[in-house]
């Protein structure tokens, strides 16, 4: 979507307390920061802004996301390890879990979880949704954090009365 249209939509929905979900590749995040910061709505990063897991959680792109998340208007979906992984489901997406864990630990009130079902355009493998549920406790081991991730935060974002 062109930025001017994106901004117009954001301006229209702001009065309703709605939010914008952005799908962005991590390497494009830096150039979008001023634009995203200027939007009047909350902004939710889909798929953790697609970090390059090979660079680790200290990579420049993921650090940019973490810095943005310090501003309360930004939220993040801890979704799609199956799209980001290099090691795959056989290793419980262990290369993606540190990213999910870091977001959940640092921003427990502004992270969401989902399966990305029905997993459109998957090329490598079809994920097992049961396994995706099972790994929640690996990156959000505390019951209180799981409740925020799965219940409280979605309620706050989607039904922010």
Q: What annotation goes with each model-predicted range?
A:
Residues 116:
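Active-site glycine-centered loops adjacent to acidic/histidine catalytic or metal-binding residues
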Residues 21, 121, 135:
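Generic anion/oxyanion-binding catalytic loop in active/binding sites
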Residues 1-113:
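Catalytic pocket-lining loop regions of alpha/beta-barrel enzymes
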Residues 89, 122-125:
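Alpha-helix N-cap/helix-start motif
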Residues 102, 107-110, 124-161:
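Mid-to-C-terminal alpha-helical segments outside catalytic/metal-binding sites
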Residues 83, 119-121:
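Short, active-site-adjacent cap segments at secondary-structure transitions
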């Amino acid at each position: 979507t062109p930025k001017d249209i994106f901004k117009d939509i954001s301006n229209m929905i702001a009065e309703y307390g709605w939010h914008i979900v952005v799908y962005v590749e991590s390497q494009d995040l830096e150039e979008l920061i001023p634009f995203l910061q200027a939007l009047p709505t909350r902004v939710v990063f889909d798929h953790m802004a697609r970090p390059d897991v090979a660079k680790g959680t200290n990579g420049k792109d993921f650090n940019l996301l973490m810095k943005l998340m310090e501003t309360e208007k930004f939220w993040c979906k801890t979704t799609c390890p199956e799209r980001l992984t290099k090691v795959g489901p056989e290793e419980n997406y262990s290369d993606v879990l540190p990213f999910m864990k870091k977001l959940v630990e640092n921003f427990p009130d502004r992270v969401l979880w989902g399966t990305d079902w029905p997993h459109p355009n998957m090329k490598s493998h079809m994920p097992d949704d049961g396994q995706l549920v099972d790994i929640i406790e690996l990156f959000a081991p505390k019951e209180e954090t799981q409740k925020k991730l799965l219940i409280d935060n979605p309620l706050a974002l989607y039904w922010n009365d």
